[in-house]
Amino acid sequence: MNQVEVALDTIPVHVTVNSEPRLSHRPSGLYPMFLLAVLATVMMLFAAFTAALIVRRTGSDWVPVQIPSVVWLNTVFIVTSSILLECAKKAFSRGSGSQASLWLGYSIALGVLFLIGQLIAWSVLNDQGFLLSTNTHAAFFYMLSGVHGAHVLGGIGVLVWTLRRALAGAYGIDQYRGVAHAAIYWHCVGAVWIHLLVLLSIT
């Protein structure tokens, strides 16, 4: 019995330590494909709205309205929000998760302010008597800003989910692709709004 124990003690044991970085928090290859599909859908949707507005604007019953001034402040909100998302990405690349989470929180707050500002713009137009049924220009503003606002709301949901993962330590120096993908969508939503604002401002 002792000889067996001695023999077992002399068997070499090799332990392999996996030094590869953890990939559990990295999105799979399906995420970029899904993102591209979403962006393509958004672009086609607003391209159709753009064409409809251009055609409708040539009608004899087109009466332009003054875009509420709060809309320009809203534009500053959403542009600044995109800039702060880029700051968050850079903070993650430096390994500063707490700073990145702070930038994400500010970006979300500005997105919420943007939506509140759009509701104020609707209220201003309504108080001036420009309703969906009484003015075509105002109707397009309600429709386009409403559809766009729905996409902004969806983007805020994604950013909130991203922030929760960031606070849970899911992202690091080499593990923040999820943040990058969320930023791409948010930048797209911001660019679409600038396009719509220019389109609606040209009377």
Where in the sequence are the language-model features?
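...captures the hydrophobic TM-helix bundle architecture rather than a specific catalytic motif
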Residues: 1-203
